[in-house]
């Protein structure tokens, strides 16, 4: 797995309380937590080749995806990636979030609808509200004394887990 190829400084590992105990995606959750306590680097040089195999050990991930490909009548019809439009919407949402962190009194619902359409805007508004984004925006605005600090606060709050939830919503 990807997690088997990670090198983690002991201080960072202790700061995030070690490997998360989950049924799947432990490496994703670990990297998500590590990104909040320090930089995550990508090693240069020879890459690690991960071979895939069919597996039902976990509810999602490479093993079940390989199983779907092998079970499909036409493997070319099985989606391998998230639709590119998801990332375009995600980019717009992050730009809006940056704007809102600088102007926390903005009408976020109106801007979501204006930039992303009524249906997507309403869905994202519900998800963000569920996460308590207004409180997060106020905190980011007050605590972030510089653009760099606000950006760091945004990336800490709007972490990889939340970004993936947005992609799955879309």
Give the role of each language-model region:
Residues 1-16:
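Conserved nucleotide-sugar donor-binding
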Residues 8, 30, 43, 48-50, ...:
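Generic structural hydrophobic/aromatic packing signal, biased to beta-strands
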Residues 22, 34-49, 55-56:
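Catalytic donor-sugar/metal-binding loop of nucleotide-sugar-dependent glycosyltransferases
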Residues 22-29:
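Acidic donor-binding loop at a coil-to-helix junction in glycosyltransferase catalytic cores
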Residues 41, 53-75:
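PAPS-dependent sulfotransferase catalytic core
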Residues 67-170:
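Terminal low-complexity segments of carbohydrate-biosynthetic enzymes
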């Amino acid at each position: 797995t990807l997690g088997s190829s990670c090198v983690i400084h002991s201080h960072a590992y202790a700061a995030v309380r070690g490997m998360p105990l989950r049924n799947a995606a432990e490496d994703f959750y670990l990297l998500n937590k590590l990104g909040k306590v320090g930089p995550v680097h990508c090693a240069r040089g020879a890459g690690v080749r991960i071979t895939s195999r069919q597996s039902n050990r976990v509810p999602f991930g490479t093993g079940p995806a390989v199983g779907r490909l092998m079970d499909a009548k036409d493997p070319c019809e099985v989606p391998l990636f998230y639709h590119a439009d998801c990332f375009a919407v995600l980019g717009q949402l992050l730009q809006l979030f940056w704007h809102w962190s600088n102007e926390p009194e903005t009408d976020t619902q109106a801007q979501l609808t204006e930039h992303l359409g009524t249906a997507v805007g309403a869905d994202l508004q519900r998800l963000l509200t569920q996460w308590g984004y207004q409180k997060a925006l106020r905190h980011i605005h007050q605590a972030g004394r510089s653009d760099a600090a606000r950006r760091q606060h945004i990336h800490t709050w709007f972490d990889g887990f939340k970004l993936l939830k947005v992609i799955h919503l879309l």
